[in-house]
């Protein structure tokens, strides 16, 4: 049940299927738990990052990608139900992202601060061409150095396809 709740962000991710909901419901009955309450406790415990370094937070859920054979970028993600916690993480991550860009072969870094309850993501970015890539991907301007992506919670189904398409569309504009 916990794995399904985690993978589907408590059934809010576009990756969630009817089978996920049915299986989680059946498992919750067997375990004798309330899914909503269990999910809140699980996400709260999983996102307790106060004692972690910016590096540990950044690489906790981080993946590298290559677009158009030459644009190397990395995307990390943290999901939380607590807006204050996400704001605190943001303050700690921005300076780290600056130092991390260029390491491990990536020239652009992105970080998703995903609010499960609001079903939205604040997308942090750093590196030459990263702002333009996100601007093309999401057809919007950043505000205070952040893209506020309403309805975007999935790196796999929403963020990466949009960034890949933007890389293809705007390759000559920001290489």
Where are the model-predicted features located?
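C-terminal accessory domains and tails appended to enzymatic cores
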Residues: 21-175
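Short alpha-helices
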Residues: 1-23, 135, 157
């Amino acid at each position: 049940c916990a794995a399904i709740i985690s993978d589907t962000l408590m059934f809010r991710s576009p990756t969630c299927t009817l089978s996920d909901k049915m299986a989680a419901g059946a498992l919750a009955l067997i375990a004798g738990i309330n899914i909503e309450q269990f999910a809140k406790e699980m996400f709260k415990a999983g996102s307790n990052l106060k004692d972690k370094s910016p590096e540990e937070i950044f690489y906790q859920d981080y993946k590298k990608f290559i677009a158009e054979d030459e644009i190397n970028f990395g995307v990390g993600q943290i999901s939380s139900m607590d807006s204050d916690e996400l704001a605190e993480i943001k303050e700690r991550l921005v300076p780290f992202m600056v130092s991390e860009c260029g390491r491990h072969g990536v020239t652009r870094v992105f970080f998703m601060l995903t609010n499960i309850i609001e079903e939205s993501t604040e997308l942090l970015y750093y590196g030459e061409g990263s702002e333009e890539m996100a601007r093309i991907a999401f057809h919007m301007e950043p505000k205070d150095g952040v893209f506020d992506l309403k309805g975007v919670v999935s790196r796999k189904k929403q963020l990466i396809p949009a960034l890949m398409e933007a890389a293809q569309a705007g390759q000559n504009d920001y290489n």
